[in-house]
A protein has these predicted regions:
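Active-site catalytic microenvironments in core metabolic enzymes, especially phosphate/sugar-handling
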Residues: 1-261
Length: 261
């Protein structure tokens, strides 16, 4: 199957036009008319993921994070990014990323995470100016009020999160939940204005936990943990629309952050 036939399916769900201006989603290594037989899905392209692709005969790796994000001036295997790009070219493995366009797509990243946690009646938290159905984050309702601490333990159990960093508990119970996968500290204000009892995101800094008037609880579940659902979203898109194309979920895609607890 041609790469363009595969990426066309993904981009019908999450068009590249929806990515942020700073992003580098799309085909990074390879040509649209290259023929591929099997895709590997991962959060990041790493040495381990490259080895798995070679071992399993995958000639296309589709990730959430683009391996080339900042401009590269040379390829001399000095770091993992350079090694993986060089290895992909030598091995004939194409690299494709579906990043902020998947974040902002309806039924995309935040939608999936919220649904996994039992949050319903979802709407976009920060709509795009061009299209109110597109944007970052979601806010919705739980079927009933849940103790705040118990809901955070529910997050741990459901997502396999080892550590939840959180602010002071603003309310003993939560009903309205805001979610933004990845780094979402900049949207605390939107979550507050949406009337959320708790805001679930990642990459929070020290001062981010000092929410004004303690109006809501903010919970940092980890960047990788919040975005691991990208693999399943991409798998669902491809397996539903390309039933004869082989797709594998990576067993080597792992969190680069380690915890000593």
């Amino acid at each position: 199957m041609l790469i363009r036939e595969i990426t066309d399916v993904i981009e019908r769900f999450a068009p590249l036009a929806w990515q942020e201006s700073y992003d580098n989603a799309g085909l990074i290594v390879g040509r649209p008319d290259d023929e591929v037989r099997k895709a590997l899905l991962a959060v990041d392209v790493t040495d381990e993921v490259m080895a798995e692709a070679e071992r399993e005969g995958c000639d296309l790796i589709i990730t959430h994070h683009p391996i080339v994000f900042h401009a590269l001036k040379r390829f001399n295997s000095a770091d993992q990014v350079q090694r993986c790009v060089e290895r992909a070219i030598r091995s004939g493995i194409a690299l494709y990323a579906c990043h902020t366009n998947l974040d902002s797509a309806p039924e995309g990243m935040s939608w999936r995470l919220a649904e996994m946690l039992g949050v319903a009646d979802l709407r976009v938290l920060q709509p795009s100016v061009a299209d109110a159905k597109v944007g970052f984050g979601v806010v919705g309702e739980l079927p009933g009020a849940v103790a705040t601490v118990e809901f955070m333990r529910h997050i741990q159990r459901t997502l396999g999160v080892r550590v939840v960093r959180h602010s002071d508990i603003a309310s003993p119970e939560v009903r309205r939940v805001a979610v933004c996968t990845g780094a979402g500290a900049s949207m605390i204000g939107e979550a507050r204005r949406a009337g959320a009892d708790i805001y679930i995101t990642a990459d929070m800094k020290y001062n981010d936990f000092m929410t004004p008037d303690k109006a809501l609880t903010v919970a940092d579940i980890g960047h990788f943990e919040s975005e691991y659902c990208a693999i399943q979203i991409l798998f669902d898109i491809l397996s539903k629309n390309l039933i004869t194309f082989a797709v594998r979920k990576s067993e080597s895609s792992r969190n680069p952050v380690n915890y000593l607890v």
